[in-house]
Structure formats: C-alpha cells, structure tokens
C-alpha cells in the first residue's frame, strides 16, 4: 500500500502520466516514416526564391568620414560613433601592436608573452609530430 502511494507520488512529481507511454505497434507490423512536405515557392526547381542581399550604403562625405567612425554602429537605428580627441582615449590604445606578431627571439625570456608563445609553438610541434603516428 505504501509502495503504491510512493510510486504514484513519484509519477506526479516527475509529471509522468500513463497516457504518455508510447503505443507499441503490433508484432510484424511495418513502421512508415513520413517526411515533411517541401515548401512550395516561386522560382526554379523545388526551392523558395530568396531575396537578393543588399550591400550597406557607402558614405562618401569627407567631413563625415573624418569626424565619425563609419560602420561601427551595430544597431539598425541610431547614428555612427563620433570620434573623440586623442587625449580622451587611454594610452595603451596607441601602444597596441597592429603589425605581424613578434617572433620568439624578439621577446624577453622573462616576460609572460615569451612563455605563452613558447608553449604554443611546442603544442604545434607536438601536434605535427603526432599527426603521423598510428593508433
């Protein structure tokens, strides 16, 4: 009796209903898979006609190009970001390396960047060597 109450309570707690059980098909019966119908659309062979993609508008105004960061606004509405004076930006922004990455020989051996690059190169070397090994 107590087991029946416990079983019933666990079914209610798990939101399990006897009607939710799958219906067993009869032995020897075939199951047929029905695929969804393809959407009917205008155009070529069996596909929906896609809308042509448009390129963004290109600004050619020289004053707008020199005072605003064009294309930085990610929202549909709103204006582009206005550029500020250099003194309003942090100093580290002008020290960012925009060129090719430094080689291992150019870095100081006591720096964190040196050890990160050394580890990365060792991982690349290990991956290259282990690529040809058989299982």
Swiss-Prot record:
Identify this protein by name. Answer: Large ribosomal subunit protein mL54
Matching entries from InterPro entries are given as: Ribosomal_mL54
UniProt cross-references to Pfam families, sorted A to Z: Ribosomal_L37
Q: Where is the transit peptide?
A: 1-14
* Organism in which the protein naturally occurs: Mus musculus (Mouse)
Q: Biological process (GO) annotations?
A: mitochondrial translation
User: Can the keyword Cytoplasm be found in this entry's annotation?
Assistant: no
A GO cellular component term found in this entry reads: mitochondrial inner membrane
Protein family per UniProt: Belongs to the mitochondrion-specific ribosomal protein mL54 family.
Asked if the Swiss-Prot or TrEMBL record annotates the protein with the keyword Metal-binding, the reply is no
Q: What binding partners and quaternary form does the record give?
A: Component of the mitochondrial ribosome large subunit (39S) which comprises a 16S rRNA and about 50 distinct proteins.
Q: Where in the cell is it found?
A: Mitochondrion
Q: Which domain of life is it from?
A: Eukaryota
Sorted alphabetically, the keyword list is: Mitochondrion, Ribonucleoprotein, Ribosomal protein, Transit peptide
**Where is the major localization of this protein?**
mitochondrion
């Amino acid at each position: 009796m107590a087991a029946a109450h416990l079983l019933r309570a666990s079914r209610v707690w798990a939101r399990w209903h006897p009607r939710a059980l799958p219906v067993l098909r009869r032995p020897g019966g075939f199951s047929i898979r029905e695929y969804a119908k393809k959407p009917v659309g205008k155009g070529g062979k069996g596909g929906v006609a896609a809308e042509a993609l448009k390129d963004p508008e290109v600004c050619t105004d020289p004053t707008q190009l020199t005072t605003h960061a064009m294309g930085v606004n990610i929202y549909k509405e709103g204006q582009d970001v206005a550029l500020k004076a250099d003194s309003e930006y942090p100093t580290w922004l002008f020290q960012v390396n925009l060129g090719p990455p430094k080689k291992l020989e150019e870095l100081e051996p006591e720096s964190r960047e040196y050890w990160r690059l050394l580890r990365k190169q060792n991982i690349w070397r290990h991956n290259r060597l282990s690529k040809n090994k058989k299982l």
